Amino acid sequence: MIKAGIIGGAGYTAGELIRLLINHPETEIVFINSTSNAGNKITDVHEGLYGECDLAFTDELPLEDIDVLFFCTAHGDTKKFMESHNIPEELKIIDLSMDYRIASPDHDFIYGLPELNRRATCTAKHVANPGCFATCIQLGLLPLAKHLMLNEDVMVNAITGSTGAGVKPGATSHFSWRNNNMSVYKAFEHQHVPEIKQSLKQLQNSFDAEIDFIPYRGDFPRGIFATLVVKTKVALEEIVRMYEEYYAKDSFVHIVDKNIDLKQVVNTNKCLIHLEKHGDKLLIISCIDNLLKGASGQAVHNMNLMFNLEETVGLRLKPSAF
């Protein structure tokens, strides 16, 4: 069994990670660290786990007793922890924050988007889990970058559920504000854009265009629905072939002929992609569950690869559908 520890156990991504790991046939949770909840039962915070988890939060860190450590911490906290603690040499780390997503000679974290860096992830000791918007958008663009087709600015509009803002209440997360409402935030300056550009340039070294990304807050709890527009004269049939070929060996990305909707991916680790051609404009529709394919599900996917397991183990999940 893979023995796992979690640091930062009280948030939405941690809750989803716990749910996945307790049902994973090859994994045992050794500890869930949360200084603010130490001593409390996991079910005091993640109430949906009644009858499934009898663990309690702890402020202890028995790193020598685990094989893999997940960070579900606020941005900046993973880096502080890594710099202030003695990490066992063989301990594998999966960081769900943004601290190590951008490549640097100062760290050895691999960018953990399996559809881009599968081989590197399989042999990695440290993996940086991609951001939720970044995952959804990149999966819509990677095949085009592979074929050197991203030579102009890309227009992206994407709407995310309220869980994307995290568990801590804020002015835009209250039900009375969020329900039956929409709003734009961080237009053209979202923090996930640099990691998107990094990945596209990895496949297409000549890529120097802009990702004109406008994020929206939606009034639903979970999921990301993105539309991307790229100019190209290549026929739709050829583009579909490129996408199907690129993702042929990936278990969680599916190219769909019919139009897609969010409920087809919510509560799954899937990404669905639909392609349309309108004159010289290629419309790419990409959707994921922000907490699963965009966070905890992808983290478990990376763990499976790092420990040489079949990539879908523990991730065959039922979509909500209705």
Curated annotation (Swiss-Prot):
Protein's GO biological process: L-arginine biosynthetic process
GO molecular function: N-acetyl-gamma-glutamyl-phosphate reductase activity; NAD binding; NADP+ binding
InterPro entries tied to this protein: AGPR_AS, AGPR_type-1, NAD(P)-bd_dom_sf, NAGSA_dehydrogenase, Semialdehyde_DH_NAD-bd
Catalytic activity: N-acetyl-L-glutamate 5-semialdehyde + phosphate + NADP(+) = N-acetyl-L-glutamyl 5-phosphate + NADPH + H(+)
Enzyme Commission no: 1.2.1.38
Protein role: Catalyzes the NADPH-dependent reduction of N-acetyl-5-glutamyl phosphate to yield N-acetyl-L-glutamate 5-semialdehyde.
Keyword NADP assigned: yes
NCBIfam families: argC (TIGR01850)
Subcellular location: Cytoplasm
Major location category of this protein: cytoplasm
Protein name: N-acetyl-gamma-glutamyl-phosphate reductase
Active site: C132
Keywords: Amino-acid biosynthesis, Arginine biosynthesis, Cytoplasm, NADP, Oxidoreductase
Gene this protein is translated from: argC
Top enzyme category: oxidoreductase
Family: Belongs to the NAGSA dehydrogenase family. Type 1 subfamily.
Domain of life of the source: Bacteria
Biological pathway: Amino-acid biosynthesis; L-arginine biosynthesis; N(2)-acetyl-L-ornithine from L-glutamate: step 3/4
Sequence intervals crossing the membrane: none
GO cellular component: cytoplasm
